[in-house]
From Swiss-Prot:
Keywords: Carbohydrate metabolism, Cytoplasm, Glycosidase, Hydrolase. Pathway: Glycan metabolism; L-arabinan degradation. Involved in the degradation of arabinan and is a key enzyme in the complete degradation of the plant cell wall. Catalyzes the cleavage of terminal alpha-L-arabinofuranosyl residues in different hemicellulosic homopolysaccharides (branched and debranched arabinans) and heteropolysaccharides (arabinoxylans). The keyword Zinc does not apply. GO terms for cellular component: cytoplasm. GO terms for molecular function: alpha-L-arabinofuranosidase activity. It catalyses: Hydrolysis of terminal non-reducing alpha-L-arabinofuranoside residues in alpha-L-arabinosides. Disulfide bonds: none annotated. Belongs to the glycosyl hydrolase 51 family. It comes from Bacteroides ovatus. SMART domains: Alpha-L-AF_C (SM00813). This is Intracellular exo-alpha-L-arabinofuranosidase. Homohexamer; trimer of dimers. The gene is asdII.
């Protein structure tokens, strides 16, 4: 016998098989919260790549696409709703070929360049330092600037820092004033190179460690601005890189980056973003969850040199990486975004919350039109992705206190000797004492009856939202933009400190206890 739970949103229905319903138990330790979930865990990343900047964030003041000082109005408003905490720019691989002085001054005088990393397209530099930092001010987010170590000089990076942050009577501050900005910007996060083991210079960690020490020496703090200097860190399983940097750079850096992509491999096809089967889906869940083991191992190395955890770990590139959509430009990394990607987002964020004693920032790749993006655009049209909605549902956890949980559920063995729990969860308490719980039912076919022990919590009811779809392969298109969209969720009851949640198959829910 089957019953259907209808969720009130267009194109959204989840069939719940009551006879085959599975169960899971969770205990929320509401009295044991210690670590704050930094809002920067919900960071974004924008690179000069494909249509991320041009046509995505920026169309220029003279465009017939509605804009605010050149920034797309629809995209800007969607990002404001997301409460973006930090935005990384200009790359990525582009950062180590970017020469910042080409992107200042009158736009008609800015030289063009070939974007050799990403499709060989022409970069006109109309979006530069002023455009980026002004956007961050308008969004109310922290800028994170990645400096050029691969092909740039120490002097070039030093002058860029002075240009952005000095309020004195200095050459670069006066040049900034000449270009229309009197007051210096506040810049906290400065990356000293990017992927220096690869596109950022193909360096050995020992060599890069010396370069970091040299370049960072001349990145000075001007007029009360305090830089948080970030060294270029490892790619996923390269634990030697982290060991060498911690040993040879140590507390000369404030943070060390790490990159981890949910990708099938770096040669040949990476698979379609929209055409996949359940085996592919479960493999993806296993691969994305492997980030926990990667984080543990890098953190253990860092603990060896920094027991007090003064040096932050920053996962400043993460997310899914599929083949480009058919008919799009090779090298522009434009991919669709399905319910599968939404689960990669929710499961990854659940993991990140557990390691915030060391992990202080994460930046999903990328914000618009590239890889696992929040937003897709085409000419005047815009669509919000399933990943966008996960970030919006989860933003209640920003700067909240992480609450430890115990979770018991069924697990599945998947390809490549990985094991995937069928339920993922995270919980937090905000500054007003309100508890939020996010739940993911990874099972593609069967519902979960989840019993949550709330302890001494006085909650009497819960309200929430659910994100699901008819199929794992469902996505939002320009023709049908609301296929995967949150809807109110009411399948929850609380009685004497115990909460019962009926979680449909392949669904993500965030609850607020009241």
């Amino acid at each position: 016998m089957k019953a259907k739970l209808l969720v009130s949103t267009a194109f959204l229905a989840a069939s719940v098989s009551l006879s085959a319903q599975k169960s899971a138990t969770i205990t929320v330790h509401a009295d044991q919260g210690k670590e704050i979930i930094p809002k920067e865990i919900y960071g974004q990343f924008a690179e000069h790549l494909g249509s991320c900047i041009y046509g995505g964030l920026w169309v220029g003041e003279n465009s017939d696409i509605p804009n605010i000082k050149g920034y797309r109005t629809d995209v800007f408003n969607a990002l404001k709703d997301l409460s973006v905490p930090v935005l990384r720019w200009p790359g990525g691989c582009f950062a180590d070929e970017y020469h910042w002085m080409d992107g200042i001054g009158p736009k008609e005088n800015r030289p063009k360049m070939v974007n050799n990393n990403w499709g060989g397209t022409i970069e006109d530099n109309s979006f530069g330092t002023h455009e980026f930092l002004n956007l961050c001010e308008m969004l109310g987010c922290e800028p994170y600037v990645s400096g050029n170590v691969g092909s740039g000089t120490v002097e070039e990076l030093a002058k860029w820092v002075e240009y952005m942050t000095s309020d004195g009577d200095s050459p670069m501050a006066n040049l900034r004033r000449k270009n229309g900005r009197d007051k210096a910007w506040k810049l906290k996060y400065l990356g000293v190179g990017n992927e220096s083991w690869g596109c950022g210079g193909s360096m050995r960690p020992e060599y890069y460690a010396d370069l970091y020490r040299r370049y960072s020496t001349y990145c000075r703090n001007y007029d009360g601005n305090r830089l948080f200097k970030i060294a270029s860190g490892a790619s996923d399983y390269d634990y030697k890189w982290t060991d060498v940097l911690m040993n040879r750079v140590g507390h000369r850096m404030d943070g060390l980056s790490l990159h981890y992509y949910t990708v099938t491999g770096w040669s040949g096809s990476k698979g379609s973003a929209t055409q996949f089967n359940k085996d592919d889906y479960y493999w993806t869940m296993g691969k994305c969850l492997e980030v926990e083991d990667v984080l543990k191992k890098h953190c253990t190395i860092m603990d060896k040199y920094d027991k007090d955890k003064k040096i932050a770990l920053l996962l400043d590139e993460w997310g899914t990486w599929w083949d480009e959509e058919p008919g799009t430009i090779k090298g522009h990394l434009y991919q669709q975004n399905t319910l599968r990607d939404a689960f990669v987002a929710s499961l990854s964020l659940d993991v990140f919350h557990k390691y915030t004693d060391r992990l202080k920032m994460a930046n999903i790749a990328q914000i618009v039109n590239v890889l696992q993006s929040m937003i897709l655009t085409k000419d005047k049209e815009m669509v919000l992705t399933p990943t966008y909605y996960v970030f919006k549902m989860y933003k209640v956890h920003q700067d909240a206190t992480y609450l430890p949980i115990d979770l018991t559920c069924e697990k599945m063995s998947v390809r490549d000797n990985r094991t995937v729990p069928m339920v993922s969860a995270t919980a937090s308490k905000n500054k007003d004492g309100v508890i939020h719980i996010s739940l993911s039912n990874v099972d593609a076919d069967e519902a979960q009856e989840i019993t949550i022990n709330l302890g001494d919590t006085k909650a009497k009811k819960a309200i929430g939202e659910i994100l699901t779809a008819s199929k794992l392969t469902d996505y939002n298109s320009f023709e049908k933009p609301n296929i995967v969209k949150p809807a109110p969720f009411k399948e929850v009851k609380i009685n004497k400190g115990t909460m019962k949640v009926k979680l449909p198959a392949k669904s993500i829910v965030t609850l607020e206890l009241q």
